[in-house]
């Protein structure tokens, strides 16, 4: 059973995985993927959510190695899943993705085909629409026309190359959600999300169909500042029910 932090060689470099040990007897693991320019800590909230979810499964958190290109993040996510399976054979494996990490998780789940469940936290349905919405008109135009953008702010330095956008074009997220069925999907979103509009969660749920469980929290923001504990409790209960009912 996974208990301790571990490091392995991923496709783009070393990946360190922090483990919240499973407090149950379930042979189950939840892997968490962070959002755009985020981290496995998510301002401290991710550790709290992991502690809640560990009532039913070991929880693995990691940082993408710096790439913002979603195809490369998918490669790293597949590598983490493979490493978890090698370290805990036969486990029921769940995937939680936040924001852009949720989009990477949708792609990964559709390609993997053997996950026990998927949790989408503030996850977009249309990637280009999302970034056209949150970037300035000038930033989006420059990036879309082939210019590299450099950011240096409170989250550090980051270069966005034009293939950040063009890489999105090969992925139809609603179609991938449909391909992943009958995978159970829990969707968590805040109605006042200022980055990924709540209507995107509704479209994701519609794409999933009967296997979707959608919860939209009144007000709130993209970071779930008001609702992190409540959302964590809800997803922990969902994990417990999925494992108890034997659907995994």
What are these regions (language model features)?
Residues 1-24:
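N-terminal cap/lid segment of alpha/beta-hydrolase-fold proteins
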């Amino acid at each position: 059973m996974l208990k301790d932090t571990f490091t392995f060689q991923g496709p783009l470099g070393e990946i360190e995985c922090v483990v919240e040990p499973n407090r149950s007897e379930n042979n189950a693991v939840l892997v968490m993927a962070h959002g755009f320019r985020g981290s496995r800590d998510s301002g401290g909230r991710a550790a709290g959510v992991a502690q809640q979810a560990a009532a039913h499964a070991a929880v693995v958190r990691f940082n993408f190695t710096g790439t913002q290109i979603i195809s490369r993040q998918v490669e790293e996510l597949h590598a983490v899943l493979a490493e978890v399976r090698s370290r805990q054979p036969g486990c029921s494996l769940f995937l939680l993705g936040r924001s852009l990490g949720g989009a990477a998780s949708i792609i990964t789940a559709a390609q993997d085909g053997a996950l026990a469940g998927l949790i989408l936290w503030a996850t977009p349905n249309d990637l280009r629409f999302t970034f056209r919405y949150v970037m300035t008109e000038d930033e989006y135009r420059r990036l879309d026309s082939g210019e590299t953008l450099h950011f240096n702010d409170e989250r550090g330095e980051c270069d966005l190359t034009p293939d950040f956008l063009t890489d999105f074009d090969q992925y139809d997220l609603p179609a991938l959600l449909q391909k992943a069925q009958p995978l159970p999907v829990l969707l968590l979103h805040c109605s006042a999300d200022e980055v990924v509009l709540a209507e995107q969660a509704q479209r994701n749920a519609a794409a999933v169909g009967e296997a979707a469980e959608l919860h939209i929290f009144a007000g709130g923001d993209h970071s779930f500042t008001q609702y992190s504990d409540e959302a964590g409790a809800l997803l922990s209960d969902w994990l417990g029910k999925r494992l108890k009912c034997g659907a995994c």
